[in-house]
Amino acid sequence: MASTTFYQVSNRNIILLRVSIGIVYLWFGALKFFHGYSPAEDLVTNTIAKITYGLLSDHTNLMLLASWECAIRILLISGKWLKPAIISVFIHMACSFTPLLFFPSLSFKHVPYGFTLVGQYIMKNIIIVSAALILWQQQKEKSK
């Protein structure tokens, strides 16, 4: 009986965790659709341009990223196709850490421990990565 109760509470917490990450993706993704609303817009466009060698315009890159983030949101909140959604979160988060390497002067006051506001904005993503790892583990256990 106790283990069943624990599972029910735990399952609710997992749903809350999944929906919370989805809300963050909705908020940050939706802002990118409107020029000047995302505080990360310049950082994002500069990073993507560096990764892709300027293959697409900044506007196109921003719209693609916003669409990707909103798609992740839909999958996480709906609970559909969770494994692809979580893999997308991992890929997105890996990319979100690249400004630490590409633009250290924007990310650090004192490398490697003194973050700027931009660096703090990037490092908070470690919380999303940790939450996604919990979701991934839960999906693995469900598929057993």
Explain the meaning of each model-derived region.
Residues 1-144:
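Membrane-interface extramembranous regions
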